[in-house]
Curated annotation (Swiss-Prot):
Substrate binds at residues 75-77, 94-95. This is NADPH-dependent 7-cyano-7-deazaguanine reductase. GO terms for molecular function: preQ1 synthase activity. Catalyzes the NADPH-dependent reduction of 7-cyano-7-deazaguanine (preQ0) to 7-aminomethyl-7-deazaguanine (preQ1). The keyword Cytoplasm applies. It is an enzyme of class 1 (oxidoreductase). Belongs to the GTP cyclohydrolase I family. QueF type 1 subfamily. SUPFAM superfamilies: Tetrahydrobiopterin biosynthesis enzymes-like. Pathway: tRNA modification; tRNA-queuosine biosynthesis. It comes from Exiguobacterium sp. (strain ATCC BAA-1283 / AT1b). The lineage of its organism: Bacteria, Bacillati, Bacillota, Bacilli, Bacillales. Keywords: Cytoplasm, NADP, Oxidoreductase, Queuosine biosynthesis.
C-alpha cells in the first residue's frame, strides 16, 4: 500500500477510538482501489448489529451482510465497524436502517454495485429481512442490480436454518 493511499484514514491503528452510539455517517472512510480494472466482490458480515425500535425503544439485533463491487474506492473496515456501532442507540425501523446504510455507502464509495441485507432476529414471532441494492446507472451493474433484486430470496429460509 502506498503512503498516499492511507493519508485520509484517521481511525485505523488508533488505540483510543471514541465509540459513538448515535447514527454518525461522518465516521465512514474510504481508500483507493488499487485494482479498478478488475470486477471483484468485497463482502462484510456484521453479526452484532444493534439498533432501537423507534416506538418501544427496545433493542433490535441483526446480522448485516454487505457485498459490493468497488470502482475507485473501498470502505475502510474499522470505519465501517464504527459506523455500524453508531446505530446502537438510533431509533429506526429495520427497513430504514438497511436503506440508510446502503445509501451512505453508495455516497462514500460510488461503487459499481452494492447490496445490503439485514437479517433481524424475530420480535413478536416475526423476523424482518430487508434488502437494498444499487447498480451504477447507465452500466451493466444497473441491470445486474435489477436482476438480483427480482431474484432475491426466491427460497426463503425457515426459522430453524437462520
Amino acid at each position: 500500500m502506498r503512503p498516499e493511499d492511507l493519508q485520509d484514514l484517521s481511525l485505523l491503528g488508533q488505540k483510543s477510538v471514541p465509540y459513538i452510539f448515535e447514527y454518525t455517517p461522518d465516521v465512514l472512510e474510504a481508500f483507493p482501489n488499487r485494482h479498478p480494472e478488475n470486477d471483484y466482490f468485497v463482502k462484510f458480515n456484521a453479526p452484532e448489529f444493534t439498533s432501537l425500535c423507534p416506538i418501544t425503544n427496545q433493542p433490535d439485533f441483526a446480522t448485516i451482510y454487505i457485498s459490493y463491487i468497488p470502482d475507485e474506492k473501498l470502505v475502510e473496515s474499522k470505519s465501517l465497524k464504527l459506523y455500524l456501532f453508531s446505530f446502537r442507540n438510533h431509533g429506526d425501523f429495520h427497513e430504514n436502517c438497511i436503506n440508510v446504510i446502503g445509501k451512505d455507502l453508495v455516497k462514500l464509495m460510488e461503487p459499481r454495485y452494492l447490496e445490503v441485507w439485514g437479517k433481524f432476529t424475530p420480535r413478536g414471532g416475526i423476523s424482518i429481512d430487508p434488502y437494498y441494492n444499487y447498480g451504477k446507472p447507465g452500466t451493466k451493474y444497473e441491470k445486474m442490480a435489477e436482476h438480483r433484486l427480482f431474484n432475491h430470496d426466491l427460497y426463503p429460509e425457515t426459522v430453524d436454518n437462520r
